[in-house]
Amino acid sequence: MAEKLSIVFLDASTFGDVSLKRFSESWNCAVHRVTAPAEAAERVCGRDVIVLNKVVIDEALLDSAAAKDLKMIAIAATGTDNVDLEAARARGIRVCNVPGYAAQSVAQFTVALILELATRVGGYGELVRAGAWEKSPIYTLLEFPSFELAGKSLGIVGYGNIGRRVAEMARGFGLETLIAARPGSEGPGPQGRLPLDEVLKRSDIVSLHCPLTPQTRNLVDSRALALMKPGALLINAARGGLVDAEALIQALREKRLAGAAVDVLTQEPPPPDHPLIKAAKELDNLLVTPHCAWSAREARQRLMDEVLENILAFTRGQDRNRVA
């Protein structure tokens, strides 16, 4: 079965420079760097397996004649919201994902975002490039507020693989970690977790690491932001839909928050008029990065190794990382 598989990669450019040679050595592979929605059906046609990262596979496509040979969807990511899992399950199409591959990369990037907001290294670098240091009347520049992390509190919302690694790294800086219970739960949760509202009230920094679900959409809204400490920081390297963008922008404009850093938006790539993209060009206390927290070279290699293992398991009739 393995040698007869026909596989199509729909958005291989998202894997960067990671080699796909092991796939092409084993199976008949077609590799597309990007796939627009209108191109998906044609490229899926006649294929046994789809490998994708963020291309949308909905019920309409799965119902079309193009998908009649489709047996497996290999999601090269942890999140599965771009694939209609129920529709795939109903049609006997196996769907697998790759959990945990980028935990170290995302945690490291999260800490980098915290450090950037706390120390403004990038801002000072920009001032030097602009010639501001040469014109300074004193030996230094003190244009940006900065603070030490030691003795501050970090609230972590979402305590899976990534949240745990962030907590481990944060303790090395002397941060106290406060772990939020699942949204909607009452009282202390497992492992001494605190109600979300209490974490928001007590934390100097709040970092989001939970999945986007109907329960967590706009989890950080105007009400949640009002609970946060004056001068607190917000970090979101999870999902854009967790935060009400307009409410966040207002809190930053009014200086109720000292800063925010987001690596994810509700639409990616964003349109030029996305509220957070526009605000990032105006506000010096907002940092937006292009959904790259996951993308360390080691994480991308780990991702493709796991996708390969998922497909190999499928050829043996075994379940591995199956989500539908």
Residue locations for each model-derived region?
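N-terminal Rossmann-fold NAD(P) dinucleotide-binding loop
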Residues: 163-164
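Short, conserved active-site loop motifs that form the nucleotide-linked donor/cofactor pocket
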Residues: 27, 93, 191, 285-287
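Rossmann-like dinucleotide-binding domain for NAD(H)/NADP(H)
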Residues: 95, 231-233, 237-324
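Short, Asp-centered acidic motifs that coordinate Mg2+ and/or phosphate
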Residues: 48-49, 72, 205, 233, ...
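Phosphate-binding beta-alpha-beta segment of Rossmann-like dinucleotide-binding domains, i.e.
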Residues: 99-153, 168
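An N-terminal-biased, well-structured beta-alpha scaffold segment characteristic
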Residues: 1-96, 201, 221, 227
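Rossmann-like adenosine-cofactor binding region
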Residues: 57-63, 176-178, 182-275
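Glycine-rich Rossmann-fold phosphate-binding loop(s) that bind the pyrophosphate
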Residues: 12, 159-160
